[in-house]
Amino acid sequence: ISGNMRMEAVIEPVKGLLISLNMIYEDNRRTELQYMVDGMPVIRGGSFAMSTVAISNYGTQAFNKFMQNREIIATRVHGQYRNLNLQDIFPEGNPVIKSNSADVLIPAFISAYTGRNPDKTGLTAFPDILTLLPNWNISYRINSLTLNHRYVSQYRVGSYSSFLSWKPVTDNKNSNLGYIRDPASGALIATTPFDIPAVSIIESFNPLIEAQSVLYNDVNMSVRLNKTRSLNLNIASNRVVETSDNDFI
């Protein structure tokens, strides 16, 4: 099942200046029936991508914000379970929400690197379509000179699948609150249904600035600066890896 949406708007506020705004939202889902396994369990999974904006959230400052946001998000996640009567599931009544769990790390990552308020960021790895932010392409032409600028940024969940042992804590079919059993210790771990190994934000200015000109002798001249950045949150290793690249052409 695919739920993909693309939107684009082009405006020309002044002659020669074209501004293109575009947004994408891709929610691809799959369902697998394991008919060769006892009980024929169903595995759900898929991939996800949406346009966003991550400008100004760079380096150490953004990472420190990510670390701080974990505590705020963990408190909010715990609050979702706190109002439920879970003594028959968890011996202590409420589960312990760890700051390095996927349910905490992913919203903290999104809020830190897209500049969102951690008190209002959705507690999900799949942000709502209403949180889409546009990317843009700007072109300005005057006489024989053309200036170009383009910004593309996407938040992505490359691939995920459901936990086979996941069980819900409520009868509400719209709720993702539940738990799995740790295969090593046997302890119950509060979690949403999906095992998400990694999420990322890919950002590029392609170009940051480009100047194209046709000289009087019909020779084309072009100067271009590209900037790209990749942010990857690996859940298993609890690492955020940031890489960047600058190209001058």
Tell me what each language-model feature is.
Residues 1-249:
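Exposed, low-structure sequence patches enriched in small/polar residues
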